[in-house]
Amino acid sequence: MSKRYLIRTNISPFDNPTYYDAVRKNVVRSNSGNLLFPHSLIRALMTDDDTVFDPVNTHGSFSDEEIDRINASYDAFLIPLANAFRISFMEELANLTALVRRLTISCIVVGIGFQGNLSGDISRGFKWADTARDFCKAVLEKSAKIGLRGETTAKFMDYLGFQRDKDYQVIGCPSMFLYGADLPAPKPLSLSPDIRIHINSKVDLPQKLHDYLKGVCDAIPDHYYLPQNQYELVAMYTGIPLSYTRPDLKTMPAHYPTDPSHPLFRQNRIRGFVTVPSWLDFLRQGDLNFGTRIHGNIAAILAGIPAFIIAPDSRVLELAEYHRIPHTTVADLDEKTSVFDLLENVDFNSVLDGHKERFETYLQFLCDNDLPSIYHAMDASAKSANNEEDTSHSATTNHKDDASHSATGNRQENTPTTSTSCPFDKKISEIDFRPPLVPYRHLAASDHFDAMRFRYTFLAKRMIKGVLRKA
């Protein structure tokens, strides 16, 4: 019987929303990176065409009727998370704890992380430690282990009183295992001003970083900026300056694309993403990915593009270290070093080192939590084939036929092949995903009306909030 999963995400990988719906409904959960790890997890667990993955938003509370329906309808509740151990997420984490406690089905956390400064210091006290501890206890009553993003989070779990291997396992980010043990080798890079570079960052980072990225753009004319935050997608789609979509920021950094007058807006060199396939397709057109966003750079790695991260905090750093993604930190960045000198001796193939072993750890985590995957099914199929035809030629042929989701080896091509024998890939291949979002003034004429409609609705709501605050 096919499995039925409830999964914490705002959008299914098979959804193809209009720009209007994507921005209005915040399908990226405030950050496009949140699309990537559910996408990968669903691919792994979709063992047949009838496997069900229903998205759920966990921001609010659930009625008794909703809880009864979930318990009766699903085999497990999948909770792929990012930097959930942070103070600004504690309210939703408490909501999640309450939800998990009321469920009778399995509840599995895949890839949770701790957000702190670059030192990863967890020796100080945390006022919200009890909230985090309660969440972990609730989850461990419904699962075998909790999957962590990296070693800094492991230290935090130790601080909370949990034990490695017994209560948790470091598995990295599920997004890195989109193709299983296979990972595309980064395409060769010849550093020069003539390459095409894709840059990712965010507004609330030190000015020295924005200055450095401005220098990168000056040095490499063929550049694109790829924002990930919801407030930037709103600014792109509507033409409303970032100062309106992020009123909590008292000042805007110099050089950052904050409004339609910025050269990146005017020259149509900004792209936003609300589906993973359109994101990867766009990244494949570049030569280099560069910036501060962990999933923006993981997406490039999955697209077979060399990626380099400037880590601003522990949540990014621990994943870069675990998955051996080339990186430096904001603290270590020397503004006087050109991007060409910075990257001159970087080994972009380091992401391949140990990837198979990391995947096997991830696969074991899925096994420990009784989550059957396409990789388990494939292993069973391979064993059956070997029993029927006990020849090395037959085994090699079967391995090649299923290369897109083989459980062994690293791919040596730039773009991994997908296979229609994989239910997820087959379903994705049938969808004509919309291209990336472009700045307001460059939208197709057919999209302008909806963009204008959203613009005036957004401004009206902001105006009403301002009046109510003054009252």
Question: Predicted regions span which residues?
Answer:
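Active-site anion-handling motifs in enzyme catalytic cores
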Residues: 1-393, 398, 403, 408-470
